[in-house]
């Protein structure tokens, strides 16, 4: 909120501050605007209310001032009057209809403001006009919260008397008692508790009033709560007690009081930290730690991650507290879950005084910690030279490796402090030592661009061409120094893009400096690693322009070819990673810009695929070909740019093409860039290709056009653009399907309608695919009701044409009852009797799929329940043979299907159910059979149902057949009886004479 100079304000505002009603009247009479706004949208009435001048307020309102005007914080004059505790001003404003429920931007009403500012008289005027005193602001706080927070005893009394909810909570579930306790308003705390406030209440994170008071050092409130008998060791959601909180905030007086009242000094929280851990770490916890130790706190207790209080002092460098812990029995070499002692932790964080204390007290400097590293490893890795000096003086085998074979010198080289390097070298560290990957300290220094470390190592004799297990030298690592990783690390601390870019430039220069020094000391830039890459490849891959320039000056290595086992050239690597500056350096030294990688892709292809516009521009400007196809998919850079929707790259490629036909170039599958753009839904790319007159009716190897693909993938805007270019909608693919078929199959009713209008206006409109299926077949098969409705609006679809497996069959076979109902309602109901080329009716289809609702629909439309197909089977037989018990139940019990019908092999429904082992279906049929002749009916193999049931081991069916009079002596064509012994496999049973 700005502070304005009174002398610069309008005369009316100055007169209000002067308190001169006569001058105000004169100014108003001179048409001074009574509703004029200042820079913060405050009116003269806001000023008068702020001053609490009732007479002037009255005068302004009678002169037309808006009583409920809001400033830019949404504060009304009533808010201002209440804040000034002016009862008279409040009464005048309310008399003139001031809104007592008005809210500011924090949703605070005048009552909130009154409560916060101890405006008791104002509150007494406002409250009778309110429906509730428990209205909450944006933070969920009521007027009682504000009164308690500010310690206004009289206001709290008034609000409680007027019905304020004493246990109302804000959005963090904090009560008025929490706020009063935190602020140390003992009289308010006592008053709230006396009126029934819940003394053990918790907020969302489990903090009680005791936690709140302890955190802010409110000793009197803490004593009062303890005297009331609250649970002293109550925990919050993190497992912290009031003692934890007091120690964390360095409230030693509260700590002393809690200990005197019996608080558990060794209570662990959810992470296993005790109050002593917090006291050891906190900024102001020294006295707290003394109190805890003197009252029996366990100095060696460990958290869940193994940290002792001594570890905590080591993290934060609290060396005085570390001495206290050690003097009271703290274990110096206690290890955490990573194996680190306090000395490791202190070394990592660079606390020299603490290291001195620990070593003096007997800490083991040669103890192995995380990854078997010494404290010296960690000090060197984090570039703490003074700590290294302290640790070196204790004496141990300096070249002892960690788990990964790294010595302290490796760590120092990675850390980048040359003083650490010199200290270790002067102590006899061997710079020839290799880690388990074969890397020397020089490799580490180069990888991190630590120039002075590289210089120190090379000067003392380090081999600049020493290779690691992957065949990489220090030059490889310097060339590959990851700027983006450094940028990311810097970004954790800074969020300024300019600053990050400057930092990147500094690192780039460091890398170039390191590289130049290595080259000056006979580093060989031609050495290739085991993947065939040399330092030029790495510099290109990581975009180090300066490094590339240096390397290209120093080497005659032919890097145009992907030789030496390398899969990609430097040009490919720079293009793929979008390093246009590095690319430009390479282009100056290259003759062939169209060299290929192992898959036949050029650098231009990779740049276009990744969408690196500047790289694409650099390549095409230098003459890179856009016609070169890869070896696998036969795609060009045009295809590559389209796949990921890189329209800028696509435009560059098209505008530099000499041959306009390039826009329709095809890949191995016959796909043009337009087809791919449509398939992937890249609208801008589609628009650009159409602008460049791409052929909308080009077909791929399966006959699909871009329109086919657009409808298949459902990209609406792409389809619309193709239709606007009059793309053929009757073009058939290799299966004879048009875009209409795909629209119907995919459920695109809107497109289908639009396509139909165009298709039906053309002559020779054939809408059958190679199998005779129409769009109606496909819509029905996939259950697309909206599409069916669109198609049935056209007269030509109200009769079934094409494949005799009709649209009704298609709907029924997949259980689309609503689609079938649409067809039956729009077309002659006699279509239920339509047969496919195998003579099967729609009822057969419903029975086959066990679709009960479809069966019932067809039966309601007089479907012939006993109609047989070409093999003599009824719908019941179809259901029985396929084990569709639901369909069998409906056909047998509701439709009363004929159980005596036989197929061409003389099988009854019962034979078929039993032959396939469908016990439930067989029992449903048996339940309706009373005729023994049907029970003993024989098929063409002279088998009765009993023969088949016995052979298939259907025990329950056999029992039911026998109960219904099945003949056990019946003989089939192999002379087998249903109850006789089975013949051995491969032998014939001799016929009885």
Swiss-Prot record:
Matches recorded under InterPro entries: Ankyrin_rpt, Ankyrin_rpt-contain_sf
ANK repeats: 7-36, 40-69, 73-102, 106-135, 139-168, 172-201, 205-234, 238-267, 271-301, 305-334, 338-367, 371-400, 404-433, 437-466, 470-498, 531-561, 566-595, 599-628, 633-662, 669-698, 702-731, 735-764, 771-800, 803-832, 838-867, 871-901, 905-934, 941-970
Annotated spans, Disordered: 974-993
Gene3D superfamilies: Ankyrin repeat-containing domain
Domain of life: Eukaryota
Keywords, alphabetical: ANK repeat, Repeat
Function: Putative regulatory subunit of protein phosphatase 6 (PP6) that may be involved in the recognition of phosphoprotein substrates.
Subunit structure: Protein phosphatase 6 (PP6) holoenzyme is proposed to be a heterotrimeric complex formed by the catalytic subunit, a SAPS domain-containing subunit (PP6R) and an ankyrin repeat-domain containing regulatory subunit (ARS). Interacts with PPP6R1.
Name under which the protein is recorded: Serine/threonine-protein phosphatase 6 regulatory ankyrin repeat subunit B
Species whose genome carries this gene: Mus musculus
Gene name tied to this protein: Ankrd44
């Amino acid at each position: 909120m700005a502070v304005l100079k009174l002398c610069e304000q309008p005369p009316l505002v100055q007169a209000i501050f002067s308190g001169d009603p006569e001058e105000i009247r004169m100014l108003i009479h001179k048409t001074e605007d009574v509703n004029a706004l200042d820079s913060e949208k405050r009116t003269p009435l806001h000023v008068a209310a702020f001053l609490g001048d009732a007479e002037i307020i009255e005068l302004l309102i009678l002169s037309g001032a808006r009583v409920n005007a809001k400033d830019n914080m949404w504060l009304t004059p009533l808010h201002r009057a209440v804040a000034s505790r002016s009862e008279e001003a409040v009464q005048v404003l309310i008399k003139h209809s001031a809104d007592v429920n008005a809210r500011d931007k924090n949703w605070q009403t005048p009552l909130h403001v009154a409560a916060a500012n101890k405006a008791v008289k104002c509150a007494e005027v406002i409250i009778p006009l309110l429906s509730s005193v428990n209205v909450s602001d944006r933070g969920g706080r009521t007027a009682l919260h504000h009164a308690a927070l500010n310690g206004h005893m009289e206001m709290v009394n008034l609000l409680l008397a007027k019905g304020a909810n004493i246990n109302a909570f804000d959005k963090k579930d904090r009560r008025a008692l929490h706020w009063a306790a935190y602020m140390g308003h003992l009289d308010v705390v006592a008053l709230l508790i006396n009126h029934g406030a819940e003394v053990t209440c918790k907020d969302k994170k489990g903090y009680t009033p005791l936690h709140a008071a302890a955190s802010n050092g409110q000793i009197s409130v803490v004593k009062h709560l303890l005297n009331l008998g609250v649970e002293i060791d109550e925990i919050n959601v993190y497992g912290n007690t009031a003692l934890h909180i007091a120690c964390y905030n360095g409230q030693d007086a509260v700590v002393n009081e809690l200990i005197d009242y019996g608080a558990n000094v060794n209570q662990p929280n959810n992470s296993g930290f005790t109050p002593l851990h917090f006291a050891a770490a906190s900024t102001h916890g020294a006295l707290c730690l003394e109190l805890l130790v003197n009252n029996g706190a366990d100095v060696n207790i460990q958290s869940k991650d193994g940290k002792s209080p001594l570890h905590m002092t080591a993290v934060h460098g609290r060396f005085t507290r570390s001495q206290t812990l050690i003097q009271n029995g703290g274990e110096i070499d206690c290890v955490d879950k990573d194996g680190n002692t306090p000395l490791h932790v202190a070394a990592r964080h660079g606390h020299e005084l603490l290291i001195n204390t620990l070593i003096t007290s007997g800490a083991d400097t040669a103890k192995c910690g995380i990854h078997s590293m010494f404290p010296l490893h960690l000090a060197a890795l984090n570039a703490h030279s003074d700590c290294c000096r302290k640790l070196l003086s204790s004496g141990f085998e300096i070249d002892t490796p960690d788990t990964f074979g790294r010595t302290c010198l490796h760590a120092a080289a990675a850390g980048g402090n040359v003083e650490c390097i010199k200290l270790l070298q002067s102590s006899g560290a061997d710079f020839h030592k290799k880690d388990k990957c074969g890397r020397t300290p020089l490799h580490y220094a180069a990888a991190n661009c630590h120039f002075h470390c590289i210089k120190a190592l090379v000067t003392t004799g380090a081999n600049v061409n020493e290779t690691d297990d992957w065949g990489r030298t220090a030059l490889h690592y310097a060339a590959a120094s990851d700027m983006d990783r450094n940028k990311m690390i810097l970004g954790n601390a800074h969020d300024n893009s300019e600053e990050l870019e400057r930092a990147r430039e500094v690192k780039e220069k460091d890398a170039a400096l390191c590289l130049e020094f290595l080259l000056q000391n006979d580093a060989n830039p031609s050495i290739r690693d085991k993947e065939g890459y040399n330092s030029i490849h790495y510099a290109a891959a990581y975009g180090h322009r300066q490094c590339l320039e240096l390397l290209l000056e120093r080497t005659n290595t032919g890097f145009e070819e992907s030789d030496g086992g390398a899969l990609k050239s430097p040009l490919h690597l720079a293009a793929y990673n979008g390093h246009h500056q590095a690319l430009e350096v390479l282009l100056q030294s290259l003759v062939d810009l169209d060299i290929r990688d192992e898959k036949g892709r050029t650098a231009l292809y990779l740049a276009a695929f990744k969408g690196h516009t500047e790289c694409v521009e650099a390549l095409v400007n230098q003459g890179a070909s856009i016609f070169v196809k890869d070896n696998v998919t036969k795609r060009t850079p045009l295809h590559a740019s389209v796949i990921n929707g890189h329209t800028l790259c696509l435009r560059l490629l098209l505008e530099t093409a000499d041959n306009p036909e390039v826009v329709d170039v095809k890949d191995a599958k016959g796909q043009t860039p337009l087809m791919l753009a449509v398939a992937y839904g890249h609208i801008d790319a589609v628009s650009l290709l159409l602008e460049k007159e791409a052929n909308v009716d080009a077909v791929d190897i399966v006959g699909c056009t871009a329109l086919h693909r657009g409808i298949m993938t459902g990209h609406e805007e792409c389809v619309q653009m193709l239709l606007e270019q009059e793309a053929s909608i009757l073009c058939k693919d290799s299966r004879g399907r048009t875009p209409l078929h795909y629209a119907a199959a995919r459920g695109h009713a809107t497109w289908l309608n639009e396509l139909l209008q165009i298709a039906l206006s053309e002559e020779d409109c054939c809408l059958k695919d190679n199998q005779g299926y129409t769009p109606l077949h496909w819509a029905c098969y996939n259950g697309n009701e909206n599409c069916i409705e669109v198609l049935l609006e056209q007269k030509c679809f109200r009769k079934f044409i094409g494949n005799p497996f009709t649209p009704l069959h298609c709907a029924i076979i997949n259980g689309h009852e609503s689609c079938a109902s649409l067809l039956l309602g729009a077309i002659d109901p006699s279509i239920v009797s339509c047969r496919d080329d195998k003579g099967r009716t729609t009822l057969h289809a419903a029975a086959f799929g066990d679709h009960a609702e479809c069966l019932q629909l067809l039966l309601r439309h007089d479907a012939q329940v006993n109609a047989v197909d070409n093999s003599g089977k009824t719908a019941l037989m179809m259901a029985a043979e396929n084990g569709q018990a639901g369909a069998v139940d409906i056909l047998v019990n509701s439709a009363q299907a004929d159980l005596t019908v036989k197929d061409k092999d003389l099988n009854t429904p019962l034979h078929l159910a039993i032959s396939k082992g469908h016990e439930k279906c067989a029992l449903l049929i048996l339940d309706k059979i009373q005729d023994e002749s049907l029970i003993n009916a024989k098929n063409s193999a002279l088998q009765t149902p009993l023969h088949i049931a016995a052979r298939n081991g259907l025990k329950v069916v056999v029992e039911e057949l026998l109960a219904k009079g099945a003949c056990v002596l019946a003989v089939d064509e192999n002379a087998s009886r249903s109850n006789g012994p089975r013949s051995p496999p491969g032998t014939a049973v001799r016929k009885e004479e």
